[in-house]
Amino acid sequence: MLKPMYYEFFFIFPKERELFESFLLDATHLALEESSLENLKAFDDKETIGFISQSNWHYFATHDPLKKDLKENLKEKPPHLKNFVILRSQKDLNNSLIPALEAFCLNLKQNLQSEFDFFYLSRNLASKDWLEAYKQAILPVQCTKFYIHPSWHQKPSHVVTNDCIMIDPALAFGSGHHESTSMCLELLSDIDLKRKNALDVGCGSGILSIALKKQGVSALVACDTDSLAVEETLKNFSLNQIPLLVQDKVIYGSTQKIEGRFDVIVANLVADVIKSLYSEFVRLCNHTLILSGILETHLNSVLQIYYNGFEVLEQRQRNEWVALKLLKKQPIN
């Protein structure tokens, strides 16, 4: 009997990585894993290291839209392998996703008046082997007081239940391992949230909403424009045995559906979306706004937009990712 297969794709995006990642999320609704050779070495994954180092990477470029074998080129430019994105699917997406990604690349060239390219590899493996490898790779992480772990890892006896967040990172949503999520949790942990009302924009897995509830917010609203994210948030609320009170809401849709003002707003998104939401955050924020998911290269453009309405209280950076804690400027009478 043949084993069921799954497919693994590796992508390198030299420019505007977050735009390409957003496209992959929208196109597939599958998990994306940001990784590097250093991460693979840490997990002693010699098989994958050998595969990505020795395989012939496919290449697409808007200035020369013919795929090329760039094995030798990559050997001459090892920085390409420092950061890459992994996508796993039960279906072979070579004949659908890759052409769509090429078309997206050409659209970017037309819209942004710049050249773009990407590299990719794919392989297929036995599903059972992948599932076990996946579980071994998703380890618990300690982020401030929170111990974040998947359901197949038990919490240590010395960690109290209220400091645990159980997340099974099966979809493309926050699990606490990504720098932008961990910095959000750190910034939230520094705030007294008891009896505050809070808004989580782009709730994803619900990890930040769960942290807000565990820190004592009296009313919570979470929203996401992805229906799968709303389902995942509700599932993880149940998994963590956190009841949704009458004043709590999980909304499918954007901030336009939300009324009132909030003491604390957290938004772990991407820079372009954060910039587009400025006027909404001015309308909804009463005091503190936490923004994350900003690549360092986009930080100045975000700050230029938010300068008039908010004061920067704190800025954190981990690798290329930046998070901001902002204070709403009050109008002068």
Curated annotation (Swiss-Prot):
Q: Which reaction does it catalyse?
A: L-lysyl-[protein] + 3 S-adenosyl-L-methionine = N(6),N(6),N(6)-trimethyl-L-lysyl-[protein] + 3 S-adenosyl-L-homocysteine + 3 H(+)
What changing Q317K does, per the record, is:
In strain: NCTC 11638
Look at the named UniProt entry and state the broad enzyme category this protein falls under.
Answer: transferase
The reported result of mutating A61T is:
In strain: NCTC 11638
Q: What is the effect of changing P78S?
A: In strain: NCTC 11638
Tell me the GO molecular function terms.
protein methyltransferase activity; protein-lysine N-methyltransferase activity
In terms of Pfam families, this protein maps to:
PrmA
Effect noted on mutating T144A: In strain: NCTC 11638
Keywords for the protein's UniProt record, in alphabetical order: Cytoplasm, Methyltransferase, S-adenosyl-L-methionine, Transferase
Changing P65S: what effect? In strain: NCTC 11638
What changing N107S does, per the record, is: In strain: NCTC 11638
Residues reported to bind S-adenosyl-L-methionine: T181, G202, D224, N268
GO BP annotations of the record are:
methylation
InterPro entries to which the protein is assigned, alphabetical: Ribosomal_L11_MeTrfase_PrmA (IPR050078), Ribosomal_PrmA_MeTrfase (IPR004498), SAM-dependent_MTases_sf (IPR029063)
Q: What does this protein do?
A: Methylates ribosomal protein L11.
Return the PANTHER family for the record.
ELECTRON TRANSFER FLAVOPROTEIN BETA SUBUNIT LYSINE METHYLTRANSFERASE (PTHR43648:SF1)
The family line of this record is: Belongs to the methyltransferase superfamily. PrmA family.
Protein name as it appears in the record: Ribosomal protein L11 methyltransferase
Underlying gene: prmA
